[in-house]
Amino acid sequence: GDTPLRRHVNGQRAFYEWTRGAGGAGEFRLPIIEATFAWLDEHWPDDEGPTVVSWGDGRIGNMIYRDFEPVAALDWEMASLGPRELDIAWMVFIHRFFQDLAEQYGLPGMPGYLRRDDVAATYESMSGHTARNLDWYLMYAALRHGIVMTRTAQRSVHFGEREMPDDPDELVMHRATIERMLAGTYW
């Protein structure tokens, strides 16, 4: 790719190809992931914004706190260069993913926490940077997490903890979320 964001997305495409076993005997396709890549290509941001160091997995579970103040940031294996919105959207999406899981299991979760507009406004007030193209970056976060969840599910199949589904899209734990995002009905 010719920009840090293009390289980032191309890296995710390569990870997807590896995850699905491209070229191997057990190769399969995930239509939901491929539809999301197509959506991202079709809606690519006109202005990607400035390039910064992206944490990659910035979320509450990867921070250490002392007296309610963050003192350490953990889990840097997804670090890269790219727009700030990569981290903003990842934090919002991952919280929403776990919120949806909590509700699915009849738990209240924290529905008023890390809401997209609140996070964007707080980020702007603290940094002076206005988050742009947040819908695009949230879709990209959902895609990235979908590929990670696919790989996690594949390991469960490999170790005999579950069967390989007839529909590979079922490997994506939040498939319904991505479908609703693609339809414009999730947020």
Task: Show the residue positions of the predicted features.
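Solvent-exposed, charged/polar functional surfaces in cytosolic regulatory/catalytic domains
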Residues: 11, 15, 39, 43, ...
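All-alpha amphipathic helical-bundle segments outside canonical DNA-binding/catalytic cores
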Residues: 129-141
